């Protein structure tokens, strides 16, 4: 199943946002990221987790300090909210998958807070690839060849 051009751009923008955020993260931003992460990791409510996941990615986009990147990612998140919510539900049902994604978020947040731009970009790429893998699994199970990666 091929990904659309928009999906490639979104992945690149997410990676660029992580890289820029690592260079711009203030102490307040670090506290906010850790707070969102703690809420995400402690919540067992899937709807709350989906909202917190979105909040984390949105916060990274804001910290990046590039309005164009933030606005494009925010618009994409609005358009793909249903797909992401379904993907998170699928991840929660799979053994250890939620733990894997939580660990990716944790490592990403720490790279951003520590200012490691290259590591933040790499970890965001890996995170996006993981989410894409789950979206493709869902599509294969449902026999839908039109579902493509969005986040």
Give, region by region, the residue ranges found by the protein language model:
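Single conserved hydrophobic/aromatic residue that forms the stacking wall/gate
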Residues: 1-5, 9
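Alpha-helix initiation/capping motif
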Residues: 6, 49, 94-98
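Glycine-rich loops and low-complexity Gly/Arg-rich segments
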Residues: 76, 96-98, 147
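Conserved amphipathic alpha-helical segments that form helical-bundle/coiled-coil interaction surfaces
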Residues: 10-86, 104-111, 119-133, 138
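Long, positively charged, glycine-interspersed low-complexity recognition regions
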Residues: 139-151
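Extended hydrophobic/aromatic segments used for targeting, binding, or gating
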Residues: 83-98
């Amino acid at each position: 199943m091929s990904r659309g051009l928009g999906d490639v751009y979104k992945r690149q923008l997410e990676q660029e946002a992580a890289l820029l955020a690592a260079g711009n993260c203030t102490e307040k931003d670090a506290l906010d990221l850790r707070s969102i992460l703690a809420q995400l990791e402690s919540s067992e409510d899937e709807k709350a987790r989906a909202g917190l996941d979105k909040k984390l990615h949105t916060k990274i986009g804001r910290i990046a300090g590039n309005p164009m990147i933030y606005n494009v990612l925010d618009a994409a998140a609005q358009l793909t909210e249903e797909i992401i919510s379904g993907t998170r539900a699928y991840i929660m049902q799979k053994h250890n998958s939620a733990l894997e994604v939580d660990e990716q978020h944790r490592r990403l947040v720490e790279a951003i807070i520590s200012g490691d731009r290259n590591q933040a970009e790499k970890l965001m790429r890996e995170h996006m690839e993981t989410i894409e893998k789950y979206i493709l699994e869902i599509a294969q199970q449902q026999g839908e060849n039109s579902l493509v990666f969005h986040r």
